Curated annotation (Swiss-Prot):
The keyword Membrane does not apply. It catalyses: L-histidyl-[protein] + S-adenosyl-L-methionine = N(tele)-methyl-L-histidyl-[protein] + S-adenosyl-L-homocysteine + H(+). The modification Phosphoserine is found at residue 513. This is Actin-histidine N-methyltransferase. The lineage of its organism: Eukaryota, Metazoa, Chordata, Craniata, Vertebrata. It comes from Plecturocebus moloch.
Length: 595
């Protein structure tokens, strides 16, 4: 996909003769592992730690220079082989071609008119690289012994990719040789480019991603050099940080969840050919057909011959796109910033507020979102703020009063205020909090816009500045929206306007918005706990997408798909202490605002 292609592409084969001994690198990686496994730094110390880790990583990269294997020629030179391989193995290759679209990079272009909802692309399971195929590969023996590979399918998939890339006769060579040689994820940012993200919400996840990737590399370098089941891996003599960063980014930008063959659970997969599609706003139009055992994609809209074919990756913020996919999407209708709010236990009404929130299914402390679109807050955040600002009398009404249950159900419905005073308080509170968050940035919106006019900015620097600008614009919109609502409800209160009456027939049931959704993103809109049942009809998948606005998300220029516990990115911390040395944590980059 698009913006990921670069000058040269990784190749299987042999690298340059090593000029540094494994023992020397082992000593450096041991130092790196120790540094990355230290407790989280205190407030204001994250940048210092990042620079220290980066210094060690750069020292390792310098000593390993020239050791990574590469493909000859350009990425696009191998596209014909990919199409031939895909066709011979049952994938659709008619009606589109791979083209460089400059701004968006490589993507698919229609060679004929394609109608909306027309099935135009399918890829059978045999072409997919999955955790299951990793288990059955040369990686299998090590996988069976290493708890980290077993616990983190994304890391297993990254090593599967590395092993197959280093095997000239790999079945997946036609796919692997068309992958980009490098990416625009923050793992590839120069230090000066990362500086542009300082004081943003995203910076915490950027630090976490870098630290966890370094920790994983340090851990697995030792494993590959010392574990008996790693002796036959083609990585034994050449496993560089550059290799691991590439594999991590390849998987992070492409991985998706699909059902296993028996349909009993989900697994991670890389989907050749299909992952060339670029992103636009819309609905999920890809599903997995268990009957035919293949990934299927229908057209998001009408595409005329000569037009680029887009798909929708999912309802992700630009922070998620930049960090996990390496691109910034202008006019992202699902963009948002995080805001962490909680009821203080020192609040004398804490117990009552906690009980009302519990009945509404909302925790007393949570990460919410302020959205790019109107309204800026979800039903869940509205309900939380209403409870947060309730008086003792209002709390009693929601716990013990007449129609208490109905009152709970309407907490998230903007049509039925608790009271005019409550509305004034909650919008005042939100206005103040968003204003405070805006003040934490080191630059203004106007300054960011001015910097973006600099023609000498790198692609990654521009992406970083756009991200911090986007965060501020969302917060500024929230401030203006909150101020407008505050004045409206203040006027209603002054005029002593009657509160809207509600009836059972028009109760607005509390539900999470897209922005606050934590449902797993799966090819077929399945929740892992429920298991995978009959294959979804494509039209049913589209219909369901309209309701849930969640489902399959695409690869290369896309977000990592699947449940957050397994593959939100390659750097998520596992639940078991035993594997902490190599697992990464997914810290929520939030600004905690607690009353």
């Amino acid at each position: 996909m698009g913006k990921k292609s670069r000058v040269k592409t990784q190749k299987s084969g042999t690298g340059a003769t090593a000029t540094v001994s494994p023992k020397e690198i082992l000593n450096l990686t041991s130092e790196l592992l120790q540094k990355c496994s230290s407790p989280a730094p205190g407030p204001g110390k994250e940048w210092e730690e990042y620079v220290q880790i980066r210094t060690l990583v750069e020292k390792i990269r310098k000593k390993q220079k020239g050791l990574s294997v590469t493909f000859d020629g350009k990425r696009e030179d191998y596209f014909p082989d990919l199409m031939k391989w895909a066709s011979e193995n049952g994938a659709s290759v008619e009606g589109f071609e791979m083209v460089n679209f400059k701004e968006e990079g490589f993507g698919l272009r229609a060679t004929r008119d394609i109608k909306a909802e027309e099935l135009f692309l399918w890829v059978p399971r045999k072409l997919l690289m999955t955790v299951e195929s990793a288990k059955n590969s040369v990686l299998g023996p090590l996988y069976s012994q290493d708890r980290i590979l077993q616990a983190m399918g994304n890391i297993a998939l990254a090593f599967h990719l590395l092993c197959e890339r280093a095997s000239p006769n790999s079945f997946w060579q036609p796919y692997i040789q068309t992958l980009p040689s490098e990416y625009d994820t923050p793992l590839y940012f120069e230090e000066d480019e990362v500086r542009y993200l300082q004081s943003t919400q995203a910076i915490h996840d950027v630090f976490s991603q870098y630290k966890n990737t370094a920790r994983q590399y340090a851990y697995f370098y030792k494993v590959i050099q010392t574990h008996p089941h790693a002796n036959k891996l083609p990585l034994k003599d050449s496993f560089t940080y550059e290799d691991y960063r590439w594999a991590v980014s390849s998987v992070m930008t492409r991985q998706n969840q699909i059902p296993t063959e028996d349909g009993s659970r989900v697994t991670l997969a890389l989907i050749p050919l299909w992952d060339m599609c670029n992103h636009t706003n819309g609905l999920i139009t890809t599903g997995y057909n268990l009957e035919d055992d293949r990934c299927e994609c229908v057209a998001l809209q009408d595409f005329r011959a000569g037009e680029q074919i887009y798909i929708f990756y999912g309802t992700r913020s630009n922070a998620e796109f930049v960090i996990h996919s390496g691109f910034f999407f202008d006019n992202n209708s699902h963009d948002r910033v995080k805001i962490k709010l909680g009821v203080s236990k020192s609040d004398r009404l804490y117990a009552m507020k906690a009980e009302v929130l519990a009945r509404a299914g909302i925790p007393t402390s949570s990460v919410f979102a302020l959205h790019f679109t109107e309204p800026p807050i979800s039903a869940q955040l509205l309900a939380f703020l209403r409870v947060f600002c309730m008086t003792e009398e209002e709390l009693k009404e929601h716990l013990l009063g007449d129609n208490a249950i109905d009152r709970i159900f309407t907490l998230g419905n903007s049509e039925f205020p608790v009271s005019w005073d409550n509305e004034v308080k909650l919008w005042t509170f939100l206005e103040d909090r968003a204003s405070l968050l805006l003040k934490t940035y080191k630059t203004t919106i106007e300054e960011d816009k001015s910097v973006l006019k600099n023609q000498d900015l790198s692609v990654r620097a521009k992406m970083a500045i756009k991200l911090r600008l986007g965060e501020k614009e969302i917060l500024e919109k929230a401030v203006k929206s909150a101020a407008g609502n505050r004045e409206y409800y203040r006027q209603q209160m002054e005029e002593k306007a009657p509160l809207p009456k509600y009836e059972e027939s028009n109760l607005g049931l509390l539900e999470s918005s897209v922005g606050d959704s934590r449902l797993p993103l799966v090819l077929r809109n399945l929740e892992e706990e429920a298991g995978v049942q009959d294959a979804l009809n494509i039209r049913e998948a589209i219909s369901k997408a309209k309701t849930t606005e969640n489902g399959l998300v695409n690869g290369e220029n896309s977000i990592p798909n699947g449940t957050r516990s397994e593959n939100e990115n390659l750097n998520q911390e596992g639940s078991k202490r035993a594997v902490e040395d190599a697992k990464g944590s997914s810290s929520d980059s939030t600004d905690e605002v607690k009353e």
